[in-house]
């Protein structure tokens, strides 16, 4: 009679401990990220001006986070990663998705010539 109670309590304890451990690990990871971002050597470059009427290769490279001389494969990979993060169907901005696509097209056409 006592065996099912002991087994149930043991399973509940293991589940609770696992949940607690997962939360501790997640907090530690977010704390490390916060410390990395708040260090003086970590800077984020921002652009004060908006987008140009016609996107330039320099602006396209800046949007994708690449160099203007990047290969088609690098452009393709970076475009895919940014679209996964910013796709409108996943809650991202359709404006940003449009700019990411335009940047890919500008860099791809520049590098094919």
From Swiss-Prot:
Signal sequence range: none
Native species of this protein? Dictyostelium discoideum
Q: Which biological process, per GO, is one annotated for this protein?
A: regulation of cardiolipin metabolic process
Q: Give any GO molecular function from the UniProt entry.
A: ATPase activator activity
For this chain, the family text in UniProt reads: Belongs to the TIM14 family.
Lineage top rank: taxon = Eukaryota
Q: Which Gene3D superfamilies match?
A: DnaJ domain
This entry carries the following GO cellular component terms, namely:
inner mitochondrial membrane protein complex; matrix side of mitochondrial inner membrane; PAM complex, Tim23 associated import motor
- What this chain does, per the record? Mitochondrial co-chaperone which forms a complex with prohibitins to regulate cardiolipin remodeling. May be a component of the PAM complex, a complex required for the translocation of transit peptide-containing proteins from the inner membrane into the mitochondrial matrix in an ATP-dependent manner. May act as a co-chaperone that stimulate the ATP-dependent activity.
Q: Which InterPro entries match?
A: DnaJ_domain, J_dom_sf
Transmembrane stretches, start-end: 5-22
Q: What is this protein called?
A: Mitochondrial import inner membrane translocase subunit TIM14
List the keywords (alphabetical).
Chaperone, Membrane, Mitochondrion, Mitochondrion inner membrane, Protein transport, Translocation, Transmembrane, Transmembrane helix, Transport
Q: Quaternary arrangement and interactors, per the entry?
A: Interacts with PHB2; the interaction associates DNAJC19 with the prohibitin complex. Interacts with TIMM16/PAM16. May be a component of the PAM complex at least composed of a mitochondrial HSP70 protein, GRPEL1 or GRPEL2, TIMM44, TIMM16/PAM16 and TIMM14/DNAJC19.
Q: Which Pfam family, any one, appears in the UniProt record?
A: DnaJ
């Amino acid at each position: 009679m006592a065996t099912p109670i002991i087994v149930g309590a043991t399973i509940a304890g293991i589940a609770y401990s696992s949940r607690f451990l997962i939360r501790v690990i997640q907090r530690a990871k977010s704390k490390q990220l916060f410390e990395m971002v708040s260090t003086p050597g970590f800077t984020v470059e921002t652009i004060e001006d908006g987008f140009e009427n016609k996107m330039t290769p320099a602006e396209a490279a800046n949007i994708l986070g690449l160099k203007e001389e990047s290969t088609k494969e690098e452009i393709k990979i970076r475009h895919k990663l940014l679209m996964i993060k910013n796709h409108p169907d996943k809650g991202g901005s359709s404006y940003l998705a449009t700019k990411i696509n335009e940047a890919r097209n500008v860099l791809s056409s520049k590098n094919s010539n």
